């Protein structure tokens, strides 16, 4: 199970840290995603264009999957492993009505948020516009 922590300094700056306790060994490398980078979601239903550049630890599976990172606006995000607790939309069950929101796979959520959001508030609003699958 992964752990994340934020610490606010006496100067008002925020520092972010995390552990990478996944169920399988990761071989992450440092990757940079440029502003304006375009990619298709894993469902291949939507083309996404990043507003912000970002840097983080990622693995080229392919595609390149970011475990964490920070963008040019200072917004940070991370994938945390919570076995048995995380639940996502099961769009393959046939019981879910047609949903017009773009499906974003859990493993591409960090890239999606870092590329499109400048703040936690903006990321929270963005989550209402997508379907995490």
Please name every model-derived segment.
Residues 1-101:
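A contiguous strand-loop segment
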Residues 98-133:
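Proteins synthesized as precursors that undergo proteolytic processing into mature forms
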């Amino acid at each position: 199970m992964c752990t994340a922590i934020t610490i606010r300094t006496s100067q008002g700056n925020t520092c972010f840290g995390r552990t990478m306790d996944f169920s399988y060994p990761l071989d992450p490398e440092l990757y940079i995603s440029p502003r304006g980078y375009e990619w298709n979601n894993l469902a291949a239903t939507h083309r996404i264009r990043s507003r912000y550049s970002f840097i983080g630890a990622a693995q080229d599976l392919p595609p390149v999957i970011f475990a964490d990172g920070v963008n040019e606006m200072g917004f940070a995000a991370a994938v945390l492993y919570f076995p048995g607790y995380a639940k996502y939309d099961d769009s393959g069950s046939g019981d879910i009505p047609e949903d017009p929101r773009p499906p974003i796979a859990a493993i591409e959520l960090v890239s999606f948020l870092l590329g499109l959001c400048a703040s936690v508030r903006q990321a929270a609003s963005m989550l209402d516009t997508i379907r995490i699958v």
